[in-house]
Amino acid sequence: ASDVYKRQSMYQEALSRQLALDYCCSPADVADSKNHFTIYVPQEGRRRFQEQTVCRLKIAVVNGKLLVTGSEEIVAECRKRYADVTGEWFFDMKRLRELEELLAPFGLRIAQVHPFFLPESGGIASSDLPSALLSDARDFELIRYDQDAILQFRGDDRFDQAFAFDPDAPDVLGMAAVKDGEILGMAGASADSPLFWQIGINVTLHAREMHVGSTLVRLLAQDILAQGTIPYYGTSMSHIASQRVAHRAGFAVAWAELITEEVR
């Protein structure tokens, strides 16, 4: 139990460190229960996946509260309106409509709202793999790809979730499940920051009942942890199958995030 607790506090501590860099606050600000509003200044070590050139507003809900960062005038408006609002229902439609109204005069709108997952305290150790996954794993061969080998998949839309080919967040690890020469599934990790590497996964339609996705995500997470970095996983609010993959692979929801974009 003490090992589980140690692992859980390691993940929580890492999340506080990472979100502090992403939201221009301190790790203590992330860990407490108060809302924090900061002016965005790019920090060394921030996550850079699909990074916008200018961040005018983004909001994280973590530990039941809000982290808000962006340009001074928009953050000031958010502070006025949301200083004492809790995080639990913040991404419900009523609030999102209200936020869009606040953003409209600034020429902004909501772009995405996503949940993000971290390894659960139970860990991602191979000894934790359910026997069903281990027997399934024997049904296919595992192939690992390093950063250079991943380049062969550029432009291959079968693996659009596994590899993003984002120059700011390079794809650094890949793992495929192969049977009879066919790739059944591919998991990839992008180095979104020095501390946090994001896992993406593609699985062929006919392999979805074989636990290929959760096996690959769990094994890739082990490889990432072995490098001294933290694996994380993001998906859509309504992508239940993807959330189930994360859960079966030993991940649990840790925070949710909203980003904005210019109205074109």
Where do the protein language model's features map onto the residues?
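Short, small-residue-biased leader/transition segments that mark boundaries at the very start
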Residues: 1-5
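Active-site rim helix/loop that mediates acceptor-substrate recognition in acyltransferases
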Residues: 154-172
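Conserved acetyl-CoA-binding loop-helix of GNAT-fold acetyltransferases
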Residues: 68, 199, 209-223, 244, ...
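Conserved GNAT acetyl-CoA-binding A-motif
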Residues: 66-69, 224-236
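Conserved catalytic-core motifs of GNAT/GCN5-like acyltransferases
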Residues: 110-119, 252-264
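Acyl-donor-binding surface of acyltransferase catalytic domains
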Residues: 13-151
